[in-house]
Amino acid sequence: MSTATALPPRRGRDFIARHGETVFNRIGRIQGDQVELHTPLTRRGFAQAEAIGEALSARMGESPALTLWSSPTGRALQTLAVIAEHLDLDWHATRQDVRLIELGFGSWGGETLTALTARHGPVVHPHGMAVGAPDGETYPAMAARLAAWLSDTHDHDGDRLIVMHGLSSRVLRGLMLGLPDDPYCGVPVAERLPQGSIVMIADGAESLIHRGMGAAAA
């Protein structure tokens, strides 16, 4: 899988954010890649998005030259709308790409972690990455679509903000940082971060911009 990451660092900084807490997150229910399943942010989720916006605004000022990217899920777009308002950027200019969505969980989508654990045993690896559903997307398949997005957008110069999900953002960051394959998932996986966190990747190195206060597993 690591051969898919053989790209030099992109010309520009990448700010990668994990969306805020949703009503499904709050009760431990799996969301996955179902774009049509709109699970809105909670008040805590909106506060997390506000905190990201404040952190970026303090760092970059008003109306920075920043291309907006997002997973097409409602929870990612809601989070980005709040951040964009802090930066005085046009949310309607957001570039949505389905390749940025969360891992697909097949028939597990919409199920609670408690119910799945009762039927199948532990469904979260020790480092926070979920166990893939039998009829769901595999981690190598997710890594392949994320690597394709990286390749297709590699020549886009300038800074960009990407709002996405817990599992998919960890794999995207792992690919960008050239990390070794994770023994549980078989693909590069970066450090886990709480919901409402944002990092910056520049010249192949990652730095934390804001650590969120979320508590979701990934």
Functional labels for PLM-detected ranges:
Residues 2, 6, 11-12, 17-89, ...:
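Active-site-proximal alpha-helix that buttresses catalytic centers in soluble enzyme cores
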Residues 2-13, 58, 89, 101-114, ...:
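Acidic, low-complexity terminal tails and accessory targeting/binding regions
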Residues 14, 66, 156-166:
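Generic beta-sheet signal
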Residues 22, 168-169:
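Short active-site segment of divalent metal-dependent hydrolases/proteases
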Residues 24, 39-40, 85-145:
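Phosphate-handling substructures
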Residues 60-98, 119-123, 200-218:
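Conserved histidine-centered catalytic loops in small-molecule metabolism enzymes
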Residues 70-74, 99, 146, 163-167:
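Short, well-ordered beta-to-alpha junction loops that form the rim of enzyme active sites
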Residues 82, 171-175:
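Active-site signature of alpha/beta-hydrolase-fold catalytic machinery across serine-
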